[in-house]
């Protein structure tokens, strides 16, 4: 039987940005603050989420907070600092949903700056009272971007951690999320929307397309 969360029943929508990684493939720079179109990448992600949500929650390490606060000064954000830094995105997601007051949360990584707000809104519309919804990209379900029920997501993260996994796709499997097919996804977002910026070369390629 799944463990019960101690959270109270919440309402509303949150936008969660997972940004606690070390950017080890980014030449020593925190990729969240790398410029995309003249703005820090994390600012671009926040700008995608903000119109579709009631609150923004930023998961990060304590040493990133001041830099991110400056980069996100245009937004009203809540920080959810990692209590277990460097333990991966499942710990980060659990920290973020615990910090949120929302019933559902849209989740984006800090390195996916092209997801349109309309697609985030579509995910919220498609969750339909369930535990979560994720897209299928090139016929493969992907865990981000996604919308999940915060309380159920917290429990699923805990169960995934206890099972020894640090993979978000295992969280989504535990949740039993719905998967949007590729045609529906493409109707609301181009394939470029799901591009991750993992390296400096990825950033250059992204900049050349803009």
UniProtKB/Swiss-Prot annotation:
Q: Which UniProt keywords apply?
A: Cytoplasm, GTP-binding, Magnesium, Metal-binding, Molybdenum cofactor biosynthesis, Nucleotide-binding, Transferase
Going by the record, the broad EC class of this enzyme is transferase
What are this entry's molecular-function GO terms? GTP binding; metal ion binding; molybdenum cofactor guanylyltransferase activity
Q: Which reaction does it catalyse?
A: Mo-molybdopterin + GTP + H(+) = Mo-molybdopterin guanine dinucleotide + diphosphate
GO CC, alphabetical:
cytoplasm
Recorded hits in InterPro entries, A to Z, give: MobA-like_NTP_Trfase, Molybde_CF_guanTrfase, Nucleotide-diphossugar_trans
Q: Which cofactor does it need?
A: Mg(2+)
Q: Would the keyword Isomerase be found if you checked this record's keyword annotation? A: no
| Compartments (UniProt record) | Cytoplasm
Enzyme Commission designation? 2.7.7.77
Name a single GO biological process. Answer: Mo-molybdopterin cofactor biosynthetic process
| Main location, first listed in the record | cytoplasm
Q: Which Gene3D superfamilies match?
A: Spore Coat Polysaccharide Biosynthesis Protein SpsA, Chain A
**Entry binding sites for Mg(2+):** 111
- SUPFAM superfamilies per UniProt: Nucleotide-diphospho-sugar transferases
Question: Can you quote the domain comment?
Answer: The N-terminal domain determines nucleotide recognition and specific binding, while the C-terminal domain determines the specific binding to the target protein.
Annotated family: Belongs to the MobA family.
Annotated protein name in UniProt? Probable molybdenum cofactor guanylyltransferase
